[in-house]
Amino acid sequence: MEAREPGRPTPTYHLVPNTSQSQVEEDVSSPPQRSSETMQLKKEISLLNGVSLVVGNMIGSGIFVSPKGVLVHTASYGMSLIVWAIGGLFSVVGALCYAELGTTITKSGASYAYILEAFGGFIAFIRLWVSLLVVEPTGQAIIAITFANYIIQPSFPSCDPPYLACRLLAAACICLLTFVNCAYVKWGTRVQDTFTYAKVVALIAIIVMGLVKLCQGHSEHFQDAFEGSSWDMGNLSLALYSALFSYSGWDTLNFVTEEIKNPERNLPLAIGISMPIVTLIYILTNVAYYTVLNISDVLSSDAVAVTFADQTFGMFSWTIPIAVALSCFGGLNASIFASSRLFFVGSREGHLPDLLSMIHIERFTPIPALLFNCTMALIYLIVEDVFQLINYFSFSYWFFVGLSVVGQLYLRWKEPKRPRPLKLSVFFPIVFCICSVFLVIVPLFTDTINSLIGIGIALSGVPFYFMGVYLPESRRPLFIRNVLAAITRGTQQLCFCVLTELDVAEEKKDERKTD
């Protein structure tokens, strides 16, 4: 890992084919050919692809499986729906703040890139470290396991599916989607589009069925909707936390900003389209659940959508477990697509080994970063209680998201003349920062042990930053340098990859912004 000096060009490697003398003479006599393409990730994500990425990553298995996380802390349907609406509104505010950040700092990497721009390399590295070590691989392992469970469970109706079979199918799912994203960016976006449509159609079917029941007069569950509501601030805080976890993923498109066509237009537009869609779907889906199921049914169900389907879909109830699996598959694809770009950008900034910022010379996909992401997720499949690990990063997740928006306010003050294609009222980032402080403090009191473990995981990156980034390369252990050089060379040959070139136009634009 090498920290590059500001202004120093990124080293580039070019594959030069062997040519015979006759070939050279033939080339001289032939018409001049177009110069080779610049070795960079290509802008292949359209507005529709962007909407699919955001919606597909936000709508995971949670809305199908465990909306009871909000209900258990609110104790009433009325208060539960209010919390879902507040969670959606808060997520919309955060997404709008990220839309401004994404059009102002046109780099991939989401909060990592924004923290790097505002506060420098150390805090950005810690943010990258937490994602690399826990957040991304744990989340992907859990999604893959959930997918495998819903695929295998119908074959074992009276017992739990075999542990090893679930883990092997989860591993196959991760490897398949990694291959798809290594092959072509378009393959990844087409998979995303298809599975996003599938999960939205499944949720619309649930919503329509619920509204039909409601129109038929089944409104008894809403007659005293707020009866028994919990007004305890601690419980309401935990309910909001559960809702916000289901809304997570609204920053997906910010991880791939550099690959979006016309990002200054399409990034905020995709966010503006996606957020109302997801918020409306979540609220209406819960209304459908609450129309058919009473509170005890919801709280006792391991998969609320499946229980709902058993009571309403009749012979077609089998479609909902399939829909949950498809939703997980699409969500996993979006996560792999986004997190690989995070590692790619981290490598390009000198915070990870150079080999992770290589791309295939013909397909223009970050194959080493994708393979690294795949390896980390597969390692976490070995951990038997991988679901426990998700409790460690709720504190750090909201800390870094909030810090990104603090950076937005800081850059407003530090660089007031910097061009901002989208400039929000300062009211939005201030409100989001205040709410983020609340979301950071709550786990420290309600889940102290797990929060402290999360802080410890973040701080474990400090010695790695010192050894791999802060320390000059000449002072790092020779053995480590030789090993990294050998791995980099082998990866380049095996994956047919080279380091990306600096985008001169983008660099000049960034210089004009900071002048």
UniProtKB/Swiss-Prot annotation:
Q: How does it sit in the membrane?
A: Multi-pass membrane protein
Principal subcellular localisation of the protein: membrane
Q: Spell out which residues lie on the membrane's Extracellular side.
A: 66-78, 136-167, 216-235, 288-311, 385, 447-451
A cellular-component GO term for this protein: plasma membrane
Topology: which residues are Cytoplasmic?
1-44, 100-114, 189-194, 257-266, 333-363, 407-425, 473-515
User: Catalyses which reaction?
Assistant: L-lysine(out) + L-arginine(in) = L-lysine(in) + L-arginine(out); L-leucine(out) + L-arginine(in) + Na(+)(out) = L-leucine(in) + L-arginine(out) + Na(+)(in); L-glutamine(out) + L-arginine(in) + Na(+)(out) = L-glutamine(in) + L-arginine(out) + Na(+)(in); L-histidine(out) + L-arginine(in) + Na(+)(out) = L-histidine(in) + L-arginine(out) + Na(+)(in)
Q: Name one GO biological process term.
A: L-arginine transmembrane transport
Q: What is this protein called?
A: Y+L amino acid transporter 2
Organism the protein comes from: Homo sapiens
